[in-house]
């Protein structure tokens, strides 16, 4: 076990889906995985392991924000040997081409967080990127499934309520959406030489004001979940 995950060695698969919401983790386990067993309830950050079309997969809730996801990603990699991490989360859309319920494949993640500065020091602006093979597989699967999706840069923010951010400039620079976790996931994947991808569903739009309900965010977005599991299924055992 680790500080925040109460699971014995071997209880967690080498591929893990990472929803922020514990109830979304439970929804995925109950509706998509076969023979799912819960391995973690610490802080109600539920974790489950089961199989998807014969491939062993885990799903671990991470909570909200860079500090929280950093805890779980560090422990999954260092204490449980996880090699592939796929975030399945929500994001706020920006730009007129990005619609509510669209899927965003985060190729890279800009950030206003100090996590890059704290890691590299002043003057070096590291660019956290997705694993290309996972990204390519997700795009290919989305094409064959007729899922409406976008590939590009997202913004990982430290604050959910942030009126000071220049949204129009972000739109002008083709930032697709904003969320709160991807920079940490990609940074830690680079640090530990593992594989990571963020697959996001646009749950609300920052310009139009359109949004989904809390219930839909918790127990829906099946395109994103199915896409993530389809990618997970293709990952070779490591």
From Swiss-Prot:
Phosphate binds at residues 20, 24, 43, 87-90. Gene3D superfamilies: Nucleoside phosphorylase domain. Disulfide bonds: none annotated. It catalyses: a purine D-ribonucleoside + phosphate = a purine nucleobase + alpha-D-ribose 1-phosphate; a purine 2'-deoxy-D-ribonucleoside + phosphate = a purine nucleobase + 2-deoxy-alpha-D-ribose 1-phosphate. The keyword tRNA processing does not apply. Its EC number is 2.4.2.1. Belongs to the PNP/UDP phosphorylase family. Homohexamer; trimer of homodimers. This is Purine nucleoside phosphorylase DeoD-type. It comes from Lacticaseibacillus paracasei (strain ATCC 334 / BCRC 17002 / CCUG 31169 / CIP 107868 / KCTC 3260 / NRRL B-441). The gene is deoD.
């Amino acid at each position: 076990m680790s500080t925040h995950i109460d699971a014995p060695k071997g209880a967690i698969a080498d591929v893990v889906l990472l929803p922020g919401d514990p109830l979304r983790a439970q929804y995925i386990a109950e509706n998509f995985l076969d023979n799912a067993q819960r391995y973690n309830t610490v802080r109600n950050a539920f974790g489950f392991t089961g199989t998807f079309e014969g491939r062993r997969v885990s799903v671990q809730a991470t909570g909200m924000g860079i500090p929280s996801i950093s805890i779980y990603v560090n422990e999954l990699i260092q204490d449980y040997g996880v090699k592939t991490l796929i975030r399945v989360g929500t994001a706020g859309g920006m730009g007129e081409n990005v619609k509510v319920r669209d899927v965003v494949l985060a190729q890279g993640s800009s950030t206003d967080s100090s996590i890059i500065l704290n890691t590299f020091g002043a003057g070096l602006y590291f660019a956290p990127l997705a694993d290309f093979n996972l990204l390519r597989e997700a795009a290919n699967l989305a094409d064959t499934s007729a899922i409406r999706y976008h590939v590009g840069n997202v913004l990982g923010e430290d604050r959910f309520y942030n009126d000071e951010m220049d949204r129009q400039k972000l739109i002008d620079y083709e930032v697709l959406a904003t969320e709160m976790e991807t920079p940490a996931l990609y940074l830690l994947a680079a640090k530990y030489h593992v594989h990571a991808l963020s697959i996001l569903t646009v749950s609300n739009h920052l310009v139009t004001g359109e949004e989904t309900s809390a219930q839909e965010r918790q127990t829906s977005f099946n395109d994103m979940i199915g896409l993530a599991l389809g990618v997970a299924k293709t990952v070779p055992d490591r």
